[in-house]
Amino acid sequence: MPFTLGQRWISDTESELGLGTIVAMDARTVTLLFPSTGENRLYARSDSPVTRVMFNPGDTITSHEGWQLHIDEVKEENGLLVYVGTRLDTEETNVTLREVLLDSKLVFSKPQDRLFAGQIDRMDRFALRYRARKFQSEQYRMPYSGLRGQRTNLIPHQLNIAHDVGRRHAPRVLLADEVGLGKTIEAGMILHQQLLSGAAERVLIIVPETLQHQWLVEMLRRFNLRFALFDDERYTEAQHDAYNPFETEQLVICSLDFARRNKQRLEHLCDAEWDLLVVDEAHHLVWSTDAPSREYMAIEQLAERVPGVLLLTATPEQLGMESHFARLRLLDPNRFHDFEQFVEEQKNYRPVADAVAMLLAGNKLSNDELNRLGDLIGEQDIEPLLQAANSDRDDAQAARDELVSMLMDRHGTSRVLFRNTRNGVKGFPKRELHTVKLPLPTQYQTAIKVSGIMGARKSAEDRARDMLYPEQIYQEFEGDTGTWWNFDPRVEWLMGYLTSHRSQKVLVICAKATTALQLEQVLREREGIRAAVFHEGMSIIERDRAAAWFAEEDTGAQVLLCSEIGSEGRNFQFASNLVMFDLPFNPDLLEQRIGRLDRIGQAHDIQIHVPYLEKTAQSVLVRWYHEGLDAFEHTCPTGRAIYDSAYASLINYLAAPEETDGFDDLIKSCREQHEALKAQLEQGRDRLLEIHSNGGEKAQQLAQSIEEQDDDTNLIAFAMNLFDIVGINQDDRGDNLIVLTPSDHMLVPDFPGLPEDGCTITFERDVALSREDAQFITWEHPLIRNGLDLILSGDTGSSTISLLKNKALPVGTLLVELVYVVEAQAPKQLQLNRFLPPTPVRMLLDKNGNNLAAQVEFETFNRQLSAVNRHTGSKLVNAVQQDVHAILQLGETQIEKSARALIDNARREADEKLSGELSRLEALRAVNPNIRDDELAAIDSNRQQVLESLNQAGWRLDALRLIVVTHQ
C-alpha cells in the first residue's frame, strides 16, 4: 500500500504506542510520529511492521478533541481517508472527520478492530480463549457448584447438609453433629457455595479464642478462603484505614471474647453489613429467660442484623431442652419466642417420628397405622400413595419414600436443625487403649517434694496441673542445666516403641511445645529417628511443611511431635498410632487429641498408647478417663457434664495422687453417671432428624456424582495449557505432584493466587488429603478461576489468523470463525449464571455466509491449522479487509436467532425453577412454621429480578479467527 503524509498507521510490534502519523518519507524509509507517547519510529518502506488503520461504515471513532462520530461513509482524498457520519454529542449529520484528526490514544477492544489494526494474537491463545469460554459456561451450569473444590473427603452426610443449606437465601441453621463428624467442614462448604455463587460476600466467624487459628487454617487449606484474624492489635491498626475497622476486610475471624469485651467494637461489628455470621461452640452461650449472659446478648445483637447465621453446637440432647431452645431463638426469635410452647410442640413430633420409623421398617401397615398417616398428612389426598406403599407393587418403595419425604417436611425443626450421630454414620474405626505403667524417677520425686513445700499456698487446681507434668517442675528447679529426658522412663519407652515400629507412622502429642522440641532433639541424636515438630510457635507454612514431611510414605518423618495447641484443626488419618506422652486436663482436650486420627476416612483401628508415671496425677487421670468415662476407646458426649460435677473431688486427687482413699468410689460413681446419661441420650435421639440430616441414598448419589467429576481430563489439559500460555513454569515431581513457579516472561507480572516462591499442586483428591502442602486443583480453585478471568476479561486471544492447508478448496478461500458470547448483566447475588452464564456461540462462515460450525468441530479443525506471524498476518488482513467486513455483517445477521433461543430457554428454565421453589415453600408453610416470611419474599423478589435481567440479555462478538486456504 502506498504511503502518504498524514496517514494513520499502527505498529504491529508496539501496539502500546497508539495511533501513529506519517510525518516524513523518502525513497527507502518512512517516519511515524506517535503523538500519545511523543516517540518517532523509522521503518523501511519495503517491509515495515506497521498496519494501516482504516475504519468502516457502522464503526464509531473518536476525534482528537474527544467527540465521537458514527461512520456512515468512507471517502478517500489524495491517499487520505475522510470519515462522514453523525456526531454523537450534537446528533449533527454529514459531519466529516479527516483521519489525521483521529484520537492518537485509540484503544482497539473489539476483536474486528484489533484484527484490522494488526493486533493479531498467537493462534494458541485464540484456542485457549474459546476453551476458557466453553469450560467456564459448562462449570456455571454444573449442579453441584461450590461443593467440588474443597480439599475434603466426599462424605455423604456432610455433602447433604451443605447442598441443602448452601443453596438457600440467607440460611439460618443450627449444625449439631456429634464430635468427629465434621461440623467445621459443613460450615466451610456452605460458606464456599455462598461466596462462589455471589449469594454472600462478607462473612464473620466468631469462635472461642483457642480455635481461631484452627478455623483460619481450615478455611484456607480446605476451601481456599483467606480470612483475616482480628485481635486488639489488628483492630487498632485498621482504625487508621477506616472509620469502621471491620470494613477493611471481607472475610473476618475473631474470638467471642474480643467481640463482647468492648461496646464500641460490638457496635462496629453490628454495623459492618455482614452477609453471613458463623458462631462455633455456640453451646457455651449461656441463656435463661431471666438472665441471658453478655456473650449470648452480643451474638443476639449480631444475629438480628446479619441475614444468614450458622450456629455450630453440641448435640441438643447434651445441652438440655432450654439451652437448645436458646440456640433456635437466635436463629428465628419470631418463631421460637415461648419456651413452654416449644416443649409442647416437640412432644407432638413423636407420632411423626414413629410413622417414619414404620415406613422405613418396610413392613405392611395395619389399618390403624394407615389412618394415623392419613391424619398426619391430612391436607392432601394421599390415599393412592398409601395404597401403593402398602402393596407388593414395584412402586411400593417409591411411595414409601415419598410419604417419608412428606412427613419430613412437617417435622418442626428439620429446616433449621441438622444433627448426625456416629450411630447413624458408618465408617469409624475402633479405638484400642494400651497403657504403660512406668516407675517415677527419684529426680522427679525430689522435685515434687520441694515443689509441694514451696507451693503450699497454691490452689488445688494449680497443684494438680503441676503434678500432671513433673518434667516441667524438675526443669524449673534445674534451669538450663536440667536434662529430664536423660532419666524419664517415658523417653526410653518411646524410643523403644519407635525403633521396633520403624515402618509405621506415629503421632505423639504432649501438652507443651518445649516438650515436643526437646523430644525431637533426643530422638534425632540418640536413634536417628526422623521426627517432625508441630507447635503453636510455627507459622502456618512451617506447619504445612512439617505435616507434608510426616505424610510422605518413603522418605518422610516416622513421627510427628505435636503440642496441644499446635495440633488443633489438623487431622492425620493416614496414621493410626497415637502416643500421648502426657495427658490433657479435661475430657474435651482428650477427645480433641484422639480426634486427630479418629475421623471418617481412617482406614485402620486406632492404637492409643499412654505411657504414664506411677504415683503422679497421670496415674490418677488415666484411670478416671478410662474406667470412669470410657473416654479412650469411645467418644464421650457425657464427659464435660461429669467432669463439671466431679471437678472438686477430682482436682484434690490430682493435686495429691498419693491420697487414694475414696478414689475407687469416685470412679464407680462417675461410671454410673456416664452410663445413665448415655442411656438418656440414646433414648432421646431424634431418628427423624437423623434421617433428614444424613440424606440417605440421595446423599450417597451426591458424593458419587462429585467423585465422577474429579476425574475430569479436560481440567488437566486446560490447566496445563493455561499455565503454558500465561508463562508459569511447571516441574513434574512425580506422585501426581507438580511445582508451579512464576517466570520472567508471564502475561501479567503477578498471577493472582500464585505465590512469589511458587506452590505445589495436584489434581488428585487423595494426594491433596495426604499432602497438606499441595493445593488441590479443581475448576473452583482460585488459580483456575483467576486464570479464566485473566484470559476472558482482557483481549488475550480475541483476534488471530491461521492457514488451512486443504487442496480440496481453492487457494485463497476465506473462512471466518466467530465466537459470540450471549450474556446478561446483573448483580452477582442474583446468581444469574445458573440459568444464563456467559455462553459462547461458535460460527464458521464462508464468503457466502454458510455456517459450517456444526460440520467442523473446533478441536479437530484447530489441529488442521497452522500459525501465521503477525507481520504476514497484517498484510493478509489488509488484502481481504472488505471481504472480512462483509462476512462479519452476515454473522451479525445470523447470531440473533441462536442468541434469542438461548435467552428464551434461560427465561423458561428460571421461571419454572424459581416459581416451583416458591410454590413448594408456600404450600409447605401451611404445615411447617419454620419457613420464614423473609425467605419467601426474597425468593419472589429474586425471581422477578432474574426474569427482568434475562429480558435485557444481549450478545457481543468475543473473538474471531481469519482462516486463509493454502496448498503449500
Swiss-Prot record:
Pfam families: Helicase_C (PF00271), RapA_C (PF12137), SNF2-rel_dom (PF00176), Tudor_1_RapA (PF18339), Tudor_RapA (PF18337). Residues 490-685 form the Helicase C-terminal domain. ATP binds at D177, E178, V179, G180, L181, G182, K183, T184. GO terms for biological process: regulation of DNA-templated transcription. Keywords: Activator, ATP-binding, DNA-binding, Helicase, Hydrolase, Nucleotide-binding, Transcription, Transcription regulation. A motif (DEAH box) lies at residues 280-283. It comes from the Bacteria. It is an enzyme of class 3 (hydrolase). Residues 164-334 form the Helicase ATP-binding domain. NCBIfam families: PRK04914.1. Belongs to the SNF2/RAD54 helicase family. RapA subfamily. Transcription regulator that activates transcription by stimulating RNA polymerase (RNAP) recycling in case of stress conditions such as supercoiled DNA or high salt concentrations. Probably acts by releasing the RNAP, when it is trapped or immobilized on tightly supercoiled DNA. Does not activate transcription on linear DNA. Probably not involved in DNA repair. Interacts with the RNAP. Has a higher affinity for the core RNAP than for the holoenzyme. Its ATPase activity is stimulated by binding to RNAP. This is RNA polymerase-associated protein RapA. The gene is rapA.
